[in-house]
């Protein structure tokens, strides 16, 4: 029956939408990559032929191609694989049955009847249900029809009963393009409406009016398929049909939604283009309307940028808003938000002006009687405002020259502004409508604007000699009634009220200040171009900008009317209360305290709280009327804004009501804050606070940790305090559920004392609001106090304590009382209080000598709890003291530079406030030796030491005499010190101990040294201070560091007569004065330097006890000495033979050789920098110099040293910067191309292995779904930028396996196809070496893994195409990538993000901050290098667990599990490692070098004597003209790149002893002379001869409790081209060399000390980073040390002398090193030059010296 039915209706099959697809589903397992080109061409030809047959078939039998229909006839052509839909989505007999249509019988086809599709059929019945249309169906869409339109009628209006009918209905046009689909749908909907099917069309809500019948659904489906061929359907329509090929209703519904959206978009665009605004409606409503339109358009894909939006908005502004059109010139990139700020400001100004019209508007009669010849003028000496405006400017200028007390007569309208209004525009916004917050000025300062004035702007005046302004709110440092006479152009006087500074903050973030005069008697604010020119600012009227002489644009100029203006938004408003200008002669006795002063005095409390406190007498000594409150409302404290910045406030009323029924001190709230990071061990990291519910009295206690015993001690203390002081018993303590409160110890304590613990519910912070708000308030105050005072962060708890004292004394607005009053205590006497951080001078009652200064500069912290004194911080002594012997330092405000506090001098206010208290102190002073009470428990700084269990060092300190003589202790007799800002040093030694603050009476006697550095013509010599004597200045450091168990210094004292010295005269270069210094043996000098703290400035203390002082050896110093000796003992330093008595002592090493002939470019540099090279010039023996290399050495003859003159110009000299990393050198190509490995490879066996590797790679790519295998793209149809060339590379690995890799040519990838900001991270070599070293010391298992095809696990976001592999023979086709293919720019970054996410989320790892690709958890450390993983763990099962997790996602291979206890060999990132757990580790590259070096074509000498050193001292690179042809030059450069590339790779891996030679030769890669090549050959020869050398590590002693990280530094002064110095550093962890660096100094040093400072400063950042890494990977404490052989450098670093350095660059480096040493527990050691292994990094050494320095760590 089915076949008969098909044949019966075969004559109308042309009208169906059936596709010619086989009745069977085609199944194939054939890989698309294996399809040959011939088969593909046959398939395409067959498909083309079939399509042409269908095209030529008559209309009556034509069947459009549609893959969504099953054809009742078998197809004669196999389906194309590259169709618009995937093959598996094409309709088959088993897939064609639509849901709900089973009653039609056959499941393989959609039934249809003749009446549904025949154009001549009329259905039976009285009326025709479906329309008929002519046989010429399918007119193109471009053909207009009378019934087709661009709009459609809502289907709801159609007749649902379908009673009306049309005899003929014009069919819709044929769809010919996907872009025409929206218009076609409109005609199709019109066609359905005309066909009486309007009721089935979805309405605006997506639902039809009536239910569609089956016949109607069939008609709808078939007509849609006829007139909308599948190849022209949009993608979203195809997506719908791929799910349900009959769901035409969903397509219509989506189309209607899109048309509605398009209509809304069109309406929005029209509305936006026709905006109008004149202020008649609120600005908020206008902004909401505009922003909603813009947001809708952006969401719909129509992007409206800021420039277009601002233009559309400004075009519709009128009235007083019209002038905003011209603000576009001042902002090239104005945003919509900024424009609406302007509109809001004007709108608010309009509302304010309307509410106060009687105050500003003038009567109409006044306007008529107004005269322009008023006596007061506005323009001082103005001849022409803008020289460019010569025409039509006379009347405007004349108008500007006169003052009017009211508005001028209206003028005619022009293009630049709307018609003048009767109301002036008042602009009070301090940023010219842009800076947000308004400054409300008093009525006196308001001035009516002229009708031709641009509000909020300054008029540029080229003829005015002074700048005048009407408003006083932009005047800084104002002084009233200045004696200044100003006249206008008509010689008439202009009264001036004040003079001050006008400060600008331009758009290049620079600040400039000019003088300004204040007068309200002008019509414009005038900005003098002459004064701007004085500060290097000119006005360019061609570009309409203010700019500097170098062309830097500062601000735009706006042309308005006939004048030019600059916006006031660049003016900085004054942050202080402007003094009353007209009241100058105010009596001193009646002058009130300014509010900013009181605000800062009372811990930055708000004005309301302070006023309540003064009203209720909780603050005594003065009344509320004594404070000037005029500026309290508008005053903004910058420190409060920074320190108290919050997100939102806590929710109030969260506590239970019953808590109010408790008596005082019965109900407490407590909470713990912390930790505070990056603090010294002596400073607390936490504090615990308590608040009484009834009185709101607060207590705070410092904590170092949150242990149970620490918390219990605090609870015991506060309960005893409340019981004894207030006779109250605590009943309830409310706290959160932290472990510090819920532990069993505290719970038993509370239970024993009868106290009920009240815990908050989980995650209910609101129930703990009292304690939370207190902590927030105290922290706000703390940040503000530290910000205001500039004190270091380790004093943070002192700020908390100060704030607590003040907060307990301030009245609550609710209770009208302070916490002290509620508790029954007296109010706080403010005369006893100093601002936090107030500079003071503390009296030293026991100075070093009678001639030493008696004052020590300090900073007041807070009143003492235990005495009438004050807690004061002394930076020079690193102490806090409790004393009454201090005097306030006048004129010193410790402020930050970014705020203008220069004008905030409250000296007189502070003197008046503390006068009575100072007199009380003066009359009751007790001259006793214990005035400085250091044993009080005032705060944590005096009570807590680094190691309290160790005996305290009572050695005293000397006060540095560098400070100026302090003022007298009597305030009334002291003179005002010059007002320069003094800030507390932020970076000082924060370690505070309980040792004595002032020096003891026993002193060590040492001579005074004043001359530190000689700066003669040579700049060579530095007087070695530590040689002469141990500095007394070291006393300054000794007591503060005595408590450190890890300190590198000792406090031993030596007498000047302890040994017999011989005076040796030393003359400084270029000078005539001779210094007589004692000659000291090297051994004694070394001992003194290591155990002393040398300094630049030393003070000679008195010695009254004896001439011979025995060193004081306390247990602390002995412990320090043991620590020092243990660190030095761990280092691989050479063992020196006994020195000859003829050798000179070490001080002379600092003397560089004085030689009149010296080259500027050398491999060996100046040679040995020791003084004996110059003083006693000895030629080394032949065996020290010979290097037996049997290749050409014609150019290696030793040349006479040339003079120190700049090199002559050369025809070809190419010098590059020193090599910073291995990747900067062009690597050697070790891979083969496809033709080399397969096509032309004559080695059959090797070829077969490469072919096998080739197929293995292709199969792996297919397995990983690297590209889309369903479709191939024509090369001509793809954007060339997205096409990436591909290639196969082949190589043979060291294990003998042959590998093939199919890669993309990322080197020619277009920048638009990848994100340039993405980074491909790999593990840093220092991180790997650190991990290996820690593994050896901790007996870790080392497991090596490899992830196969790592990059292919990462998806690719971009649309990229590559050429198929060559075996497919599809050269003109492309395939689209789906994975991050090898070679792409973004592949590495994509893989890194993928594996990083997996390790963190699935493996429980976390990445170490600052060290990419280093992951850790509590048991395992992972170092990741692309697809290689190195796992370190003490438990091998932990490694296995990670491996199991990785195998779930990635193809993970275990290269080496590392479970054996015997020696295990690894090949990790090129390093050949031999590791025996718990014993040793050896790192080398013997196998790799044996394979690679012979391939370099270097003339090796395998039979001759081996080289003993990589280079010869004294040989210099001759930089004469290099004249070779271009081809030979390129060839030699290429050869140098290969040689230095390999040498760099080896050197930075483990051969750190070669880095100097590598770095020097790398600078000459582009200067390949014969001599440079020979030296390079010699370096490669030495590498070949020593290829079996290894970096040797031995396990650290198990008794060592700490990790020891040491950097050894050295520098060779002036031995590089252009007088640059070579610097080098070696880094050691627990005595194992883990890295090295040799480079040329970036700055030109003028002395050896500068070179050494440069070298040390280069090592400090890496030293700190390595320290952080070690602490993250291993939780043991760490000691950081610096070793150098320059005593003068150590003296400078440890000195406290802050005098100006000779060179600001090195002065900055020296000061930074001081901060590192004093603040970060970084210790500096002295090391003998002969033991300095970093010497190999800076100069070529003789063979014996080279071997001596390297044989202990590499052999």
From Swiss-Prot:
PTM section of the record: Initially, virus-like particles (VLPs) are composed of the structural unprocessed proteins Gag and Gag-Pol, and also contain the host initiator methionine tRNA (tRNA(i)-Met) which serves as a primer for minus-strand DNA synthesis, and a dimer of genomic Ty RNA. Processing of the polyproteins occurs within the particle and proceeds by an ordered pathway, called maturation. First, the protease (PR) is released by autocatalytic cleavage of the Gag-Pol polyprotein yielding capsid protein p45 and a Pol-p154 precursor protein.
Domain Integrase catalytic residue range list: 660-835
Site (Cleavage) residue list: 401-402, 582-583, 1217-1218
Catalytic activity: DNA(n) + a 2'-deoxyribonucleoside 5'-triphosphate = DNA(n+1) + diphosphate; Endonucleolytic cleavage to 5'-phosphomonoester
A GO MF term: ATP binding
Protein location: Cytoplasm; Nucleus
Keyword set includes Manganese: no
Gene Ontology CC, one term: nucleus
UniProt EC number: 3.4.23.-, 2.7.7.49, 2.7.7.7, 3.1.26.4
Compositionally biased spans, kind Basic and acidic residues: 1038-1053
Residues at which Mg(2+) 1 binds: 671, 736
InterPro entries: Aspartic_peptidase_AS, DNA/RNA_pol_sf, Integrase_cat-core, Retrotran_Ty1/copia-like, RNaseH-like_sf, RNaseH_sf, RVT_2, TYA
Motif Bipartite nuclear localization signal per UniProt: ranges: 1178-1212
Chain residues that bind Mg(2+) 3: 1610, 1652, 1685
RNase H Ty1/copia-type domain mapped to chain residues: 1610-1752
Region feature (Disordered): 1-93, 126-173, 352-421, 956-1087, 1092-1111, 1130-1186
Quaternary structure and partners: The capsid protein forms a homotrimer, from which the VLPs are assembled. The protease is a homodimer, whose active site consists of two apposed aspartic acid residues.
Record note on domains: The C-terminal RNA-binding region of CA is sufficient for all its nucleocapsid-like chaperone activities.
Name of protein: Transposon Ty1-JR1 Gag-Pol polyprotein
Species this protein is from: Saccharomyces cerevisiae (strain ATCC 204508 / S288c) (Baker's yeast)
Gene coding for it: TY1B-JR1
